């Protein structure tokens, strides 16, 4: 499934995203991801949840002294994969996001759109079932934003659920995916194939 989370500033989008990957804990209620109740997860077990997730932020959070390849490989190295498996998978995901020819470059040698592709590659290299995106096109121009959305659609088509918080009306209106509208921390609407303006209907 591909779900957009929209709403005015202060509606709770970022808080919801942070709760999904347990940056914040909900005051009440449950959040179930892959059979894990995130709300009741002990701090020492948060890593178990995060291994099942990929997260893409608006600000790229790339390691500046590592190459494109090394930035993506790092996500597998910390989990103890062997070098042969890492190389195979990293090259696969860099090919998927259109960066196979940029493996030796550093983040400051890339455009904003290319840096975001590296972030996406790093987020999916461990084959997460859920990819959480917090304003992934917020720092990009409209054309580059649509290129990033095509990459996310490809990933979604391969079986990964995507939850994306955004303010970008054009993207939401064009893509006609499920739209969840938040208002002051509450669910205002849930539309199967919606647009940014559906809440006015």
Explain the meaning of each model-derived region:
Residues 21:
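Helix-to-loop junction immediately C-terminal to a conserved catalytic motif
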Residues 131-134:
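Catalytic Walker B motif of ABC-type/P-loop ATPase nucleotide-binding domains
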Residues 29-37, 49:
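Conserved ABC transporter NBD signature motif
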Residues 66-74:
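Short coil-to-helix segment of the ABC ATPase nucleotide-binding domain corresponding to the Q-loop/switch region
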Residues 105-110, 114-116:
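Conserved ABC ATPase signature
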Residues 125-129:
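A short, proline-enriched helix->beta-strand linker immediately N-terminal to the Walker B motif
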